[in-house]
A protein has these predicted regions:
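A residue-level detector for the "anchor" residue at the start of short, highly conserved motifs
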Residues: 3-205
Length: 205
C-alpha cells in the first residue's frame, strides 16, 4: 500500500507540472503514454477519476474550475487541449465554471455534446441514469444530442433534460439550489425514484 501511495504521489506531481492542472487529494490521476521501443513519447491524455464517497476540485490548463462529485471521470488530451478548442470527455456529475476564452469549450458525454465559451452550470451525466441533465446558472450553452443531432440553446435559469433512450431534449425551469446542493455536502431529491435515492446516498457516503 505504501508503494502504491508513493507511485500515485509521483504521478500526481508530474501530471500537474506537465498539464498545468491543480488537483486536490483523494482522486486518481492517470496519464497515458505511448511507447516507441524503449522510448516513451510525451504524455497524451490526462484522466481524473473521483472515487465513491469523495469530491475534488480541479483547475484545467485554461483556468476553468471544475468541482467533481463522487464517481466522476474527466479526461482530456494534454497536447490538443486549448489549441483550436478546449475539449474534454466526461461522465458523472460536476459543477463547471468555464474560463472566458475565444476557443470553444466542449464537453463530450456518452449521449450529449455541450459547447460553451464562458459560463457556470451543473452537469449530471451518469452512465447508469436514464437521462443527462444540465442546469445553467450563468451564460449560454449549446447542447447537441448524439442520437438525434438536435441542437438547443440553453439560457440562464433553464434546465435541459436529455432522454437517453429517445435522444430528445426538453427544457424546464432551472433548479440550481437542488442541483448544486451536493457541493455543500447536502442531498436534495424531488420526484426521484427511490432506487436512485439509495444509489446517490451510497455514492456520496
Amino acid at each position: 500500500d505504501k508503494a502504491n501511495k508513493k507511485t500515485s504521489h509521483s504521478i500526481f506531481k508530474k501530471s500537474v507540472q506537465i498539464a498545468a492542472a491543480i488537483i486536490v487529494p483523494f482522486i486518481i490521476i492517470t496519464t497515458l503514454v505511448y511507447n516507441a521501443g524503449n522510448k516513451a513519447s510525451p504524455l497524451s491524455d490526462m484522466i481524473v477519476s473521483v472515487e465513491e464517497g469523495e469530491k475534488a476540485n480541479i483547475i484545467l490548463p485554461d483556468s476553468t474550475k471544475v468541482n467533481l462529485n463522487a464517481q466522476s471521470l474527466l479526461s482530456y488530451n494534454v497536447n490538443e487541449f486549448n489549441r483550436k478548442e478546449r475539449r474534454i470527455n466526461f461522465s458523472g456529475e460536476a459543477y463547471f465554471e468555464i474560463a472566458k476564452n475565444n476557443k470553444p469549450f466542449i464537453i463530450q458525454t456518452s449521449h450529449m455534446e455541450v459547447q460553451v465559451v464562458g459560463t457556470s452550470f451543473n452537469l449530471r451525466a451518469r452512465d447508469e441514469n436514464i437521462s443527462t441533465e444540465i442546469d445553467l446558472l450563468e451564460g449560454k450553452v449549446n447542447l447537441t444530442s448524439n442520437t438525434t443531432k438536435e441542437s438547443i440553446l440553453l439560457l440562464p435559469h433553464q434546465k435541459a433534460i436529455l432522454d437517453k433512450k429517445s435522444g430528445k431534449i426538453k427544457i424546464v425551469s432551472g433548479t440550481p439550489v437542488e442541483s448544486t446542493a451536493w457541493r455543500k455536502g447536502q442531498l436534495v431529491f424531488h420526484g426521484v425514484d427511490i432506487k436512485e435515492v439509495f444509489r446517490e446516498i451510497e455514492r456520496t457516503y
